[in-house]
Regions:
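N-terminal Rossmann-like or analogous alpha/beta NTP/dinucleotide-binding catalytic cores
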Residues: 59-124, 128-146
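Phosphate/ribose-recognition catalytic cores of enzymes acting on nucleotide-derived substrates
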Residues: 198-326
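Residue-level signal for inorganic ion chemistry
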Residues: 27, 81, 120, 180, ...
């Protein structure tokens, strides 16, 4: 898959079949569209092209900027899409100027001039241009003028995708990680920089990597204890990164197994929300490195214990439960 970030220097596409969307999560619902895209391109010996936007359009056209929580960062989206057999991914800078161009200009100056498409596949509810006045009917009306065909994604599929995206975010936030993974079609993951903590875990016999998630838009799971796989700066590749359509991990190398705690550590101080990962049988210094965490299963809610001894006893049990599912 070729990735294009400069829309003023795009290649000349051959019989381009394009679809347009944010594709946050690149989940099972999205793959219905992606499969249709590839099928239509194959029919005409053409190239499949996904057009997506960065930043997320809601950040530009909505006042509720703080409400934007994304399943994938841009790099993660690229990574997952790269395993799905698409020819081209075009990342369009989404600006006020782009959002406010007349709908006719969007079709003429953007879709036609940049892509010269053979076919455009869009949802029945696709809106574009100033005040979102452009719609499927306008595109259908202008298609003969510019010589492209237009195919509609049915309402039930679009609605299913919207529901899936919402359900995935809700599942991640509310600890139903197994449902999120099922809807995604792969194991949910996130990355963070390993930073210094108070090193209490070492004293308890369970050293942890404290993670700082640097992308404020990236969704992370709700508070609780989880069974996880981990990868440090790409050294251990434990997941087929979007190349598998199911939610099972593949293990070409020995995976790093572990457990993760997200929350306020009520037994210790309860003042700051932290993400801590205990990687089993691992003793390298990794401060400043990037850890990727694949969240496999929610184990239990965060609990305040009466003593550190009680906490350690529960952590012992958490490890046992983690190993059962990893």
């Amino acid at each position: 898959m070729q990735v294009h970030r400069d829309i003023d220097n795009l290649p000349t596409f051959t019989n381009a079949v394009i679809t347009i969307g944010t594709f946050d999560g690149v989940h099972v619902g999205h793959r219905q569209i992606i499969n249709k895209l590839k099928t239509e391109a194959l029919k005409i010996n053409g190239e499949s092209v996904i057009v997506t936007f960065h930043p997320h359009p809601r950040k530009v056209i909505s006042s509720a900027i703080l409400g934007v929580r994304l399943i994938n960062t841009l790099d993660e989206k690229i990574e997952v899409l790269s395993g799905l057999g698409i020819d081209h991914l075009v990342i369009v800078p989404f600006t006020d100027a782009f959002a406010n161009q007349p709908a006719e200009d969007y079709i003429r100056n953007f879709l036609f001039e940049k892509f010269h498409p053979d076919t455009i596949i869009i949802g029945y509810d696709h809106r574009f241009g100033r005040e979102r006045l452009g719609d499927y009917k306008l595109m259908e009306k202008m298609a003969p003028q510019f010589g492209f065909k237009i195919k509609e994604i049915p309402k039930h599929i679009i609605d299913e995708i919207a529901i899936s995206s919402t359900n995935i975010r809700e599942a991640i936030l509310h600890n139903d990680i197994e449902m999120a993974n099922k809807l995604l079609g792969y194991t949910f993951f996130f990355e963070g920089e390993v930073v210094h903590g108070n090193k209490l875990g070492r004293q308890l016999g369970y050293p942890t990597a404290n993670l700082k998630v640097n992308d404020p838009e990236k969704i992370v799971p709700g508070d609780g204890i989880y069974a996880v796989y981990a990868e440090v700066d790409g050294e251990w590749s434990t997941v087929n990164r979007g190349k598998s359509y199911d939610s099972q991990l593949t293990t070409p190398h020995s995976p790093l197994k572990g457990m993760m705690s997200i929350g306020f550590r009520p037994t210790v101080d309860g003042k700051k929300r932290v993400i801590e990962v205990n990687v089993f049988d691992f003793n390298k210094e990794i401060y400043g490195e990037t850890m990727r965490v694949y969240v496999k299963k929610f184990l239990r809610a965060e609990v305040k214990f009466n003593s550190l001894e009680e906490l350690v006893k529960q952590i012992d049990q958490d490890k046992i439960e983690s190993l059962k599912v990893l």
